Structures are given as C-alpha cells and as structure tokens.
Amino acid sequence: MSPPKRFQINAKNYFLTYPRCSLTKEEALSQIRNFQTPTNPKFIKICRELHENGEPHLHVLIQFEGKYKCQNQRFFDLVSPTRSAHFHPNIQGAKSSSDVKSYIDKDGDTWRWGTFQIDGRSARGGQQSANDAYAAALNSGSKSEALKILRELAPRDYLRDFHHISSNLDRIFTKPPPPYENPFPLSSFDRVPEELDEWFHENVMGRARPLRPKSIVIEGDSRTGKTMWSRALGPHNYLCGHLDLSPKVYNNDAWYNVIDDVDPHYLKHFKRIHGGPEDWQSNTKYGKPVQIKGGIPTIFLCNPGPNSSYKEFLDEEKNSALKAWALKNATFISLEGPLYSGTNQGPTQSC
C-alpha cells in the first residue's frame, strides 16, 4: 500500500474556509497578518457568514507577492482569544482570485486589507463575462467605482482601451451642474433700458427656440448689474473668462448663453455663437468633438477698453467684414448707469 500523500500546496493565492469559527473578522485579520511567510501578503479579504443553523463561518482570500509553498496543514490555524480553542481551515489554492473574491463578497459582511491583485483569469468566459463586467460597471453609480470593476473583471479592455473607457464614463456619469439661483429676482432690476427689455422678450423664449435669434452685446462699467440681470432671465449657460463647451459645463437644454469677460480676439466660434445657428460642432482640447444644439441667443458682457470691448474689436480695420455681419446678427447696447436703483442689490457678481 502506498504511503499517504503528503500535504502540500504551492500557490500565490489561497482560499481558506473556517467552519464553526466564532472569531470576528478583525480578530481573524490580526492573526493572519502575523503569520510568518517567506513571501509577503498583498491582499487579504475576510467574509463572515452565518449558515442556516446559525453557526458562523469565515471565508478568507489571501494573495501573496509570490508563490508560497505550504506543507503544514496547521499553518493557517486561528486561536480563540477567550478560550482554549483552535480553528482549523479547509485550505485550497485559488486558481482565480477574482472568482473567490466574488464568492466571498456575496453576503456583504466583509473586511479587507491591502490592494487586490488582478489575475489573468478575471476576464475568462467570453462575451457573456464581458457583458456582465460592463453591466456591473454601469450599475456602480460612479466613474471611480466603474473603473475599479473593469480593472478587475475586464483587465484587458481596461489596459488597452483605458482612454476611451475613461472618456465614455465621464459622459455617462457626469452630473449636470445644479440650477443657478440668482439672489436678485428679475423684478428688482428697475432701470433696464427699453431696448434691452425688448431684446429679452423677443429672443429668450425658453425651449421654443426662435428661428435664428439675435444675440446682444452689453457693454458697461463694472458693478452695473449686467451680469446679475443676464443670469436672472432663465436657464442658461454661463461661460466666464474662456469658452468651455464640454458636456461638463455646457448644457444643450439651456435657453440662452451668457459669455462674460472673454476677450473677443480669442473668442472661438464667433459667428456660430453670435448668429445662433442650430446643430454645429466644436472640437474640445482633449476629447471628441461635441455637438451643440444651438438655436439660442447669447448675451456678451464686456467692459469698455481694449481686449474687452466688442465694439473696439469690430472697429479694427481687419474686422470690417466681420463687423458688417455682426451688426445684422446682434444688438449692441452701452449702459449709461446701473440696471437697478437704490442699494438693495448689494455686491454684483464679478468673473
């Protein structure tokens, strides 16, 4: 008769099951971390599970830095801190640490230490496994959680297509900015010039977009209330200092745009923004072109003087043709004073 087979497991990942183990997850982790092995542990995950008869079990995944050869069946035994009791586990080498991690995650009562190490078996299983991985990512609720899931369950796609995956998740999980709340109601602006009021009622029409609306350029000194008035007319895009038409900032459902303190010499898409055409594209610096629904007017706010005034910009000799076009597609107003009376307005917004 052949001698009994000697116990030996040589693996990088270990799956341990402790039946009828009364230790807490924290107590078990503390003891496991004190095991002396020639290769260091990189990740430990513990799940406490109650069986139907009420007996507690512990499931443990240990990932080592390199392969560890275990020849002692009692090496992973745990000891009760309150009574003379040892807890001996069933010991297995984990061929797929991702599968073991998913298994012990199922009950939710888990504790972890270290950083999970991705294994090459994570994405095995063909198209259905890939679909499951991407479904889990979409259901995760955030870009960061989705990336963690794909890094573990679809490592090949994660490494090969990270740029595209990251860009797509930005679009999927980008939350629209909260609606702007103007501290001053529109009725508090009691010195609005008639021409400005007429422009508002003729061109800002909500979702029912006018056919080729006219934009408006409002030039005036600082603290005249032009920014606050412009932002009190309805849902809008507010772009200050520079033009950012990325989905994180620009909302295609806005009623109008407000462009504040942007040097006209560096205003990209001058005609498209002034003229209000529908459906045009803009190239973003680090992403794919974005589709702009258009068909809405724009309020341009500026101060007098070079590098700010649109009038002075259009009066430059080289811009004579652009000026002729702009005068047909926009109204130009110079403010003579504040758009409100009294001191109840308080400080006005400054870009």
UniProtKB/Swiss-Prot annotation:
GO biological process: DNA replication
Keywords recorded for this protein, A-Z: ATP-binding, Covalent protein-DNA linkage, DNA replication, DNA-binding, Endonuclease, Helicase, Host nucleus, Host-virus interaction, Hydrolase, Metal-binding, Multifunctional enzyme, Nuclease, Nucleotide-binding, Nucleotidyltransferase, Transferase
CRESS-DNA virus Rep endonuclease domain location: 8-116
Entry cofactors: Mg(2+); Mn(2+)
Pfam families cross-referenced by the UniProt entry: Gemini_AL1, Gemini_AL1_M
Cofactor, how bound (note): Divalent metal cations, possibly Mg(2+) or Mn(2+).
Its EC number(s): 2.7.7.-, 3.1.21.-
Residues where ATP binds: G220, D221, S222, R223, T224, G225, K226, T227
Protein's UniProt keywords contain DNA-binding: yes
Chain spans, region Oligomerization: 156-176
Segments carrying motif RCR-3: 103-106
Annotated Gene Ontology cellular component terms: host cell nucleus
Location in or out of the cell: Host nucleus
Residues at the catalytic site: Y103
Locus of motif RCR-1: 15-18
Binding site for a divalent metal cation: E49, H57, H59, D107
Positions of the UniProt region annotated as Binding to RBR1: 143-153
Family from the record: Belongs to the geminiviridae Rep protein family.
Record text on subunit structure and interactions: Homooligomer. Interacts with the replication enhancer protein (REn). Interacts with host retinoblastoma-related protein 1 (RBR1), and may thereby induce the transcription of host replicative enzymes even if the cell is not dividing anymore. Interacts with host PCNA. Interacts with host SCE1 protein.
Note on domains (UniProt): There are 3 rolling circle replication (RCR) motifs. RCR-2 is probably involved in metal coordination. RCR-3 is required for phosphodiester bond cleavage for initiation of RCR.
Descriptive protein name: Replication-associated protein
